[in-house]
């Protein structure tokens, strides 16, 4: 490389750095305001806790990603503000014996979660096992992260296992909020995995500090999702059933779903009210979509029911699930996956149109169209007759 080329390369690098800096400095007003409040609070207290950051940027905050995490960290660091796990007085309280603390924490949970000594013993055994794993120094963290980024699976595994205690220490602080201790640990471990995937060792951050963001985010998001379980009042259920019936009638007549305005006319209610009803219904009636020429059966009939105690009935349901999968495979891969996600055939949890849309990176309306088309295909005699014969088999078994 001659001298002129070197000068041009250096100029290009400087321009790129300047552009990157300009992009970094430009923040949406709502984010900038929240960061300024954190800085102000940090200067007043002399530190910032993760709880302070959670309040400023809750789990459902739009735009929470790796870049935002790094930006918050940089801004606080720039002003000489340290991030600490807890308020100083809380740190003193948490210094008690681990085993005694665990017993007290488990006592606070609902009896049905931990009334089994086996559950308690398995938790204690898990804590004992991860307690044997030595903690890493910042230098070891960076080296393992560097190797993990290059595809070293053993380095990645060691980085994860060495931070399992961190997950437990964070999970303890969220007990009594709707999830069992085991579930909290599991969700926290998912956050830890995400942190390992996204950690950039070249930034100079301590991995455990960076991972704490993702662990807390995963746990608080899981708690928030749990809290969203909707209990619909009886009068609303009746309204939803009526709306559903009118939608089916309209679809049979016109071959397409009615618009909000058309539903409003049929129901004699304003469009805004129809939107409210649909919002309340989307998580609870998704399993009611009919299958079969006579529309006398639904997807719900094929979803495994964990409350069934009889091994014979459970085996029958498992068989039906397998047969349903065979039928779904006659659809296009996208149609089949949309139905699996919408009706909870993957994990027993139905997904909203928006959630499925995010998975496929398309609009809610596009997912609705795919779903309607797929259900129309399932109503074809070549498929629906087979499903109906399975239903009759199940009826005989239950009789």
Swiss-Prot record:
Main location: cytoplasm
GO biological process: DNA-templated transcription initiation
GO CC terms: cytoplasm
UniProt entry keywords in alphabetical sequence: Cytoplasm, DNA-binding, Sigma factor, Transcription, Transcription regulation
Bias (Low complexity): 1-10
Residues covered by region (Sigma-70 factor domain-3): 238-313
One Gene Ontology term of the molecular function aspect: sigma factor activity
Pfam families per the UniProt record, alphabetical: Sigma70_r1_1, Sigma70_r1_2, Sigma70_r2, Sigma70_r3, Sigma70_r4
Locations listed in the record: Cytoplasm
Keyword Metal-binding: no
Region listing for Sigma-70 factor domain-2, in residue ranges: 159-229
Oligomeric and partner information: Interacts transiently with the RNA polymerase catalytic core.
HAMAP family, alphabetized: Sigma70_RpoD_SigA (MF_00963)
Family assignment from sequence similarity: Belongs to the sigma-70 factor family. RpoD/SigA subfamily.
Domain-related comment: Contains 4 domains, connected by flexible linkers. In the active conformation, the domains are in an extended conformation, each making extensive interactions with the RNA polymerase catalytic core. In the autoinhibited state, sigma-70 factor domain-1 packs closely together with sigma-70 factor domains-2 and -4, contrary to the extended conformation that is seen when the protein is part of the RNA polymerase holoenzyme.
Entry protein name: RNA polymerase sigma factor SigA
Lineage: Bacteria, Thermotogati, Thermotogota, Thermotogae, Thermotogales
């Amino acid at each position: 490389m001659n001298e002129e080329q070197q000068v041009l390369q250096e100029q290009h690098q400087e321009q790129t750095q300047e552009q990157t800096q300009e992009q970094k400095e430009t923040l949406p007003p709502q984010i900038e305001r929240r960061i300024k409040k954190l800085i102000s609070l940090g200067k007043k207290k002399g530190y910032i806790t993760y709880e302070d950051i959670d309040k400023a940027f809750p789990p459902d905050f739009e735009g929470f990603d790796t870049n935002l995490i790094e930006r918050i960290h940089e801004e606080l660091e720039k002003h000489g503000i340290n991030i600490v796990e807890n308020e100083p007085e809380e740190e003193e309280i948490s210094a008690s014996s681990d085993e005694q603390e665990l017993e007290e924490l488990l006592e606070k949970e609902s009896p049905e979660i931990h009334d089994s000594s086996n559950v308690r013993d398995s938790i204690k055994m898990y804590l004992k096992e991860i307690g044997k794993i030595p903690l890493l120094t910042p230098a070891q963290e960076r080296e393992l992260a560097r190797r993990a980024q290059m595809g070293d699976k053993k380095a990645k595994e060691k980085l994860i296992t060495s931070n399992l205690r961190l997950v437990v220490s964070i999970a303890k602080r969220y007990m009594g909020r709707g999830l069992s201790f085991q579930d909290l640990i599991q969700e926290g471990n998912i956050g830890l995995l995400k942190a390992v995937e996204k950690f950039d060792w070249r930034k100079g951050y301590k991995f455990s500090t960076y991972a704490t963001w993702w662990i807390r985010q995963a746990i608080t998001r899981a708690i928030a999702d749990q809290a969203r379980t909707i209990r619909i009042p009886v009068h609303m259920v009746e309204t939803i059933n009526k709306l559903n019936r009118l939608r089916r009638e309209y679809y049979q007549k016109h071959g397409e779903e009615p618009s909000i305005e058309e539903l409003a006319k049929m129901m004699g209610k304003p469009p805004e009210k129809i939107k409210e009803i649909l919002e309340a219904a989307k998580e609870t009636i998704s399993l009611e979509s009919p299958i079969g020429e006579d529309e006398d059966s639904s997807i719900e009939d094929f979803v495994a029911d964990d409350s069934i105690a009889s091994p014979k009935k459970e085996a029958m349901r498992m068989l039906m699930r397998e047969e349903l999968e065979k039928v779904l495979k006659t659809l296009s891969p996208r149609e089949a996956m949309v139905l699996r996600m919408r009706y909870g055939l993957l994990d027993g949890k139905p997904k909203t149109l928006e959630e499925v849309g995010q998975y496929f990176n398309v609009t809610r309306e596009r997912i609705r169209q795919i779903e309607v088309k797929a259900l129309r295909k399932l109503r074809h005699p070549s498929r629906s007759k087979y499903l109906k014969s399975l239903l009759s088999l199940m009826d005989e078994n239950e009789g």
